[in-house]
UniProtKB/Swiss-Prot annotation:
Expressed in the kidney and liver. The modification Phosphothreonine is found at T278. Antiviral protein which inhibits the replication of viruses by recruiting the cellular RNA degradation machineries to degrade the viral mRNAs. Binds to a ZAP-responsive element (ZRE) present in the target viral mRNA, recruits cellular poly(A)-specific ribonuclease PARN to remove the poly(A) tail, and the 3'-5' exoribonuclease complex exosome to degrade the RNA body from the 3'-end. It also recruits the decapping complex DCP1-DCP2 through RNA helicase p72 (DDX17) to remove the cap structure of the viral mRNA to initiate its degradation from the 5'-end. It is found in: Cytoplasm; Nucleus. Residues 2-254 are annotated as: N-terminal domain. Belongs to the ARTD/PARP family. Residues 344-353, 523-546 have a biased composition (Low complexity). It comes from the Eukaryota. This is Zinc finger CCCH-type antiviral protein 1. Its main location: cytoplasm.
Length: 776
């Protein structure tokens, strides 16, 4: 039996680092020999620590995810003996509307460490955790913290996935999977928590992709333990057997992802389910066995098993071709913007005129004024220049970057042809893959699928992970001033963006089968013939990639040789890699020195841009600049404007999204944070919303309301020092509390709550030039 005190200490360390660490990082915090620590984690079991092994070019990387069997009681009033924690989950996450002084009004307990809760934590050997660490552990272990799951969700591959009005705002995932009691390896309901739509709902409920990934890996582990490899074959009388054509779930599009389970789980490891092993036998013989040798176990008796599938096993003939091509357009709400080739391989050999037509159709029609529609009060229509801008160049090299490579219309032509072929070639039918970042047709057209789903040429930026577990990556390169435009393409290429959502932590991986055959000449000389191993990296939600990340880098010489040997192939492999992170890894601030007189640092870690703000959208695997940033910024600076319409696409400043795709705003540091170097610092104004839906600046008077004893400068200063705090203040005889985390102002006496927003002061490009010249 593992020592309870040591296990509690290890859990405490893991939760202090986001709930997940590599074994090497954990060894740096605990003075134990590696063999002893690994044995302790194995002895504690997968109900305490989920052990994952990630294969990459540098070898095997082992990581540990903290979990627990402790649960929060779901009853509002529990009168019977209960072994669950009794607390307010929103308060645990810092999001309860009731402030600490009004906690008696909440129907759930705010006393996290009450005598009863402490005894329960002690029974689960968690008594040493503080509130923040306990919150981290429970969020990724207890399904009670997930958003509501749709009760009428019927599964994928049906004409109607659920009976709710569309779009459904609930999670379309298997509820039994989240609880660890799903008995179906080929479950009709999705096991993919990393699906784009699922992630969008998760973010709206405060769960970052990093946390969701941890939940995915824990659920994968439970599912694999409940359904060991010996029970893969589905019973023919249950759900109609495992017919290969019965399911069209998007999260089964690519199946060749690995799960490296704890040796306690399975001595043979676990691969993805294969409904029809015999049908793939011939194809598997074509796959090189050398790849499997890279996933050697360390200190165990196990070997991780690869299940690669060549293009012959992908089901590329007949109706399945057309079905694979058409499945991506299930949601097709962007069909009016992008033209997609739905024909077979012969039609993909388009003439130059057809290719030019298609490239022209790819460009988004921006800036066309919409007429005949009544303007909503909170919507501002911003004129954008037409289409995209060509020739975006990366300034900085990174593991997932392409230094000095420009996207051109010709590149996109090849990319589109490759996409069409891949849709027809690489779709294994009815293969259950959990934790996959999926895509749909319109995503592929608009953002080259925001969360991917295309083949992964496992380069330095791809990941290998358990049972389909995959990770979103984000490398934030600087973009040259000449390419400050746009969604970043001319009539052919979409640029990229990431959300203000913070993100991911820790290694996870994915190795996908690469088709050995192509259906068009264009693909045949560009597709790699065998999957490469991959590395992983992870950054904390706080944006500090070092401490909480394990980054297996590739030397510049190797990366350069790959690019120079076949730059087009390298470009396509880079673009088609769907594993990117939606966190704040990379530059988070704009360099004021660059704005003023030029930055003298040779390796500046801040973004060099000609404006003190920078609006970007995540496309492919990089952040790309919007075209008319001043118009977006001017609208954002007005607290009354919540939406900007770009033709039929809207930017939502509350959710920081363009349609459902994330956006972000980089800026210079706050004026209150760095007042001594404040020439180009961002000045923030704080507003509260009155009963007439008018935003009133703090410190200003409004009809029927006395001005408060605080102003924007005071609020900003307090916010910079304590961004999750609660600030008490007074306006006349009324006393209030302002919650920075919830951006809510609460009247202590009447309990009335008001919405609070924080917006910058608008600075135009002319203002920047004037400040740069100085006073005349």
């Amino acid at each position: 039996m593992a020592d309870p005190g040591v296990c509690c200490f290890i859990t405490k360390i893991l939760c202090a680092h986001g709930g997940r660490m590599t074994l090497e990082e954990l060894l740096g915090e605990i003075r134990l020999p590696e063999a002893q620590l690994y044995e302790l984690l194995e002895t504690a079991g997968p109900d305490r620590f989920v052990l994952l092994e990630t294969g990459g070019q540098a070898g095997i990387t082992r990581s540990v995810v903290a979990t627990t069997r402790a649960r929060v009681c779901r009853r509002k009033y529990c009168q019977r003996p209960c072994d669950s924690l009794h607390l307010c989950k929103l308060n645990l996450l810092g999001r309860c509307h009731y402030a600490q002084s009004q906690r008696n009004l909440c129907k759930y307990s705010h006393d996290v460490l009450s005598e009863q809760n402490f005894q329960i934590l002690k029974n689960h050997e968690l008594s040493g955790l503080n509130q923040e660490e306990l919150a981290c552990l429970l969020v990724q272990s207890d399904p009670f913290f997930l958003p509501e799951i749709c009760k009428s969700y019927k599964g994928e591959g049906r004409k109607q996935t659920c009976g709710q009005p569309q779009p459904c705002e609930r999670l379309h995932i298997c509820e039994h999977f989240t609880r660890g009691n799903c008995s179906y390896l080929n479950c009709l309901r999705s096991h993919n928590l990393m699906d784009r739509k699922v992630l969008t709902i998760m973010r709206e409920h405060g769960l970052s992709p990093d946390v969701v990934q941890n939940i995915q890996d824990i659920c994968n582990n439970k599912h694999a333990r409940r359904n060991p490899p010996g029970t893969r074959a589905a019973h023919p009388h249950r759900r109609g057997g495992a017919h290969r054509d019965r399911s069209k779930s998007r999260d089964r599009f690519l199946h060749n992802s690995l799960e490296f389970l704890s040796p306690v789980v399975s001595p043979l490891g676990s691969g993805p389910p294969s409904p029809d092993v015999t049908s793939c036998k011939d194809s598997l013989e074509d796959v090189s066995v050398d790849v499997t040798q890279k996933f050697k176990y360390l200190g165990t008796h196990d070997r991780a098993q690869l299940s690669p599938v060549s293009s012959k096993a992908a089901g590329v003939q007949g109706p399945s071709q057309m079905r694979a091509s058409q499945e991506f357009s299930e949601d097709g709400n962007l069909d009016d913007i992008f033209s997609r080739n739905r024909s077979d391989s012969s039609s993909s050999r388009a003439s130059a005129a057809k290719v030019a037509q298609r490239n022209e159709a790819v460009a988004m029609k921006m800036g066309m004024e919409v007429k005949g529609k009544k303007e909503a009060p909170d919507i501002d229509r911003v004129p954008f220049l037409n289409s995209y801008i060509d020739g975006v160049t990366m300034e900085k090299a990174s593991v997932s970057g392409i230094p000095g490579k420009k996207f051109t219309a010709n590149d996109l032509e090849n990319l589109l042809l490759l996409n069409d072929t891949w849709k027809n070639v690489a779709k294994p039918q009815d293969l259950q893959t959990t934790g996959r970042i999926t895509d749909s047709g319109q995503d592929k057209a608009f953002l080259q699928n925001k969360y991917g789903g295309n083949p992964v040429w496992a380069s330095a930026s791809t990941h290998n992970a358990p049972n389909g577990s995959s990770q979103i990556m984000d490398e934030t390169p600087n973009v040259s001033k000449s390419s400050t435009s746009g969604f970043a393409i001319k009539p052919a290429i979409a640029g990229g963006k990431e959300a203000v959502y913070s993100g991911v932590q820790s290694p996870r991986s994915q190795v996908l089968a690469v088709p050995g055959e192509a259906t068009t000449p264009v693909q045949s000389n560009r597709l790699p013939q065998s999957p490469l191993s991959s590395s992983s990296h992870r950054a904390a939600a706080s944006g500090s990639p070092g401490k909480n990340s394990t980054h297996t880098s590739v030397s510049p010489a190797i990366e350069s040789s790959r690019m120079t040997s076949d730059p087009d192939e390298y470009l396509l492999r880079y673009i088609l890699n769907p594993l990117f992170r939606m966190d704040n890894h990379g530059p988070k601030e704009i360099c004021q020195d660059h704005l003023y007189k030029g930055c003298q640092q040779s390796h500046c870690d801040r973004s060099h841009f000609h404006l003190p703000y920078r609006w970007q959208m995540f496309v492919y695997t990089t952040w790309r600049d919007f075209q008319d940033m001043e118009s977006i910024e001017q609208a954002y600076c007005d607290p009354h404007v919540e939406l900007i319409l770009i033709e039929n696409h809207q930017i939502n400043f509350q959710k920081m999204t363009c349609d459902s795709y994330p956006i972000r705003r980089l800026s210079t540091p706050s004026y209150e944070e760095k007042p001594l170097s404040a020439v180009f610092a961002t000045k923030w104004i704080w507003y509260w919303k009155n009963e007439f839906n008018e935003y009133i600046q703090y410190g200003n008077e409004s009809p029927g309301h006395t001005s408060s004893d605080i102003n924007s400068a005071y609020l900003e200063s307090f916010f910079q020092s304590c961004p999750r705090g609660v600030l008490p203040f007074q306006a006349g005889s009324q006393k209030y509390e302002l919650s920075f985390q919830g951006m809510i102002q609460t009247n202590i006496a009447s309990k009335t709550q008001r919405h609070v927003v924080r917006r910058p002061v608008f600075v135009s490009s002319n203002d920047v030039e004037q400040k740069r010249r100085g006073p005349e």
